Curated annotation (Swiss-Prot):
This is Chorismate synthase. It is an enzyme of class 4 (lyase). NCBIfam families: aroC (TIGR00033), PRK05382.1 (NF003793). NADP(+) binds at residues 40, 46. FMN binds at residues 129-131, 249-250, 301, 316-320, 342. It comes from Geobacter metallireducens (strain ATCC 53774 / DSM 7210 / GS-15). Keywords: Amino-acid biosynthesis, Aromatic amino acid biosynthesis, FAD, Flavoprotein, FMN, Lyase, NADP. Homotetramer. HAMAP family: Chorismate_synth.
């Protein structure tokens, strides 16, 4: 079982994550995690904070000489902007200053419902934790999960497939080629022509004091048949993936495979027909069963079927606008324009990295549940035995 917790506020001293369930013997490094953290901070349309924070992870426990040792792994990322917030975010009562309270809630954020739920008269106490800054730690945890999956030939990749209504075209490209193109893109997309139009759209909404949303896609290749289960609702892998992706700030919809389009088509155009070719095993495939289409997105009945897992998520435009929306002061009940916090114009490329990370965590967790052991070597023996079984099925 793989589980993790994150802690920390956006302008606090640091962000922290504790991961439990990573087996002994996995090679991980701060340098590798930092590459993924940099990917999260990049992208066209990001805000001024990215110029301040250059995230660098520190591994504080669970790793010795470059390998996990089986105990909980602790990761932290220091907030460089903390130096400017030491008194505003101090844990000490002597620094309390009611004059700096934030009382004007921003539409679209957790500000007002959070303040009402926790009985706060300062929405700073809500917005600091609800901020997408927290996703830095989920990317760090996801980097560890991706390293684990990579040791078994499983890759997890995130892309921007739509932004401001402009769609990227895949044009029959392989998953490897998609990753190559997206890695060169400022918008994490694989369609250079669409990228140019997406950038122009971001520029136009920025000039208007507005923000832009989009759609991200995560593709998992190499996952074996049999991850997840049909036997209980909370063990269905598609349900777990949907929850993980929906938990990302500003995500308002998730679909797997053909998703919502399945509701518009007859069943004959939706379900993936099953074929068998024994020669596939001789060519290195895990099983002779295969599909010619993948409308299911690699999951049927909550269980992986051996095809690529495909998840898409809709990200709303960031609700912090430089041309603020109307709101109401929490204390005086007077109408005001909402508070403007430093923010991005478009964070869809970052959402692709975060979605990739949370999907990797869920796939790694399901993998460990299926093939679990205390060390990487033990899990590999279990996995190899399962692959032998599949070939004979």
């Amino acid at each position: 079982m793989l589980r993790y917790l994150t802690a920390g506020e956006s302008h606090g001293p640091q962000l922290t994550a504790i991961i439990e369930g990573i087996p002994a013997g996995l090679k991980i490094s701060e340098e590798t995690i930092n590459v993924d953290l940099a990917r999260r901070q990049g992208g066209y349309g990001r805000g001024g904070r990215m110029l301040i924070e250059k995230d660098q992870v520190q591994i504080l426990s669970g790793v010795r000489w470059g390998e996990t040792i089986g105990s909980p792994v602790t990761l932290c990322v220091v907030n460089r902007d903390w130096v400017n917030w030491q008194e505003k975010m101090s844990p000490h009562e002597r620094h309390r200053d009611d004059k700096i309270r934030v009382t004007r809630s921003r539409p679209g954020h957790a500000d007002l419902p959070g303040a009402m739920k926790y009985n706060h008269r300062d929405v700073r106490n809500i917005l600091e934790r609800s901020s997408a800054r927290e996703t830095a730690m989920r990317v760090a945890v996801g980097s560890v999960a991706r390293a684990f999956l990579a040791s078994f030939g499983v890759t997890v990749s995130g892309f921007v497939v739509e932004l401001g209504g402009i769609k990227a075209e895949r044009r029959g490209l392989s998953s490897d080629r998609l990753r190559e193109l997206a890695a060169k893109s400022e918008l994490a997309t694989y369609d250079p022509e669409a990228e140019a139009r997406m950038k122009a759209f971001i520029d136009s909404v920025k000039d208007a004091g507005d923000t832009a949303g989009g759609v991200v896609e995560v593709v998992v290749t190499g996952a074996p048949v049999g991850l997840g289960s049909h036997v209980q609702w909370d063990r269905k892998l598609d349900a777990r993936l949907a929850m993980a992706v929906m938990s990302i700030q500003a995500i308002k919809g998730v679909e797997i495979g053909l998703g919502f389009e399945t509701a518009r088509r007859p069943g004959s155009q939706v379900h993936d027909e099953i074929y068998f070719d024994s020669s596939r095993i001789a060519h290195g495939e895990a099983t002779g069963f295969f599909r010619k289409t993948n409308n299911a997105g690699g999951i049927e009945g909550g269980i992986t079927n051996g095809e690529e897992i495909v998840i898409r998520a809709a990200m709303k435009p960031i609700p912090t606008l430089y041309k603020p929306l109307s709101s109401v002061d929490m204390l005086t009940k007077e109408p005001f324009e909402a508070t403007v916090e430093r923010s991005d114009v478009c964070a869809v490329p970052a959402a692709a990295v975060v979605a990739e990370s949370v999907v990797a965590i869920e796939i790694a967790s399901a993998f460990l549940e299926k093939f679990g052991g205390d060390s990487l070597a033990e899990i590999r023996r279990n996995y190899d035995g399962y692959l032998d079984y599949l070939r004979s099925f």
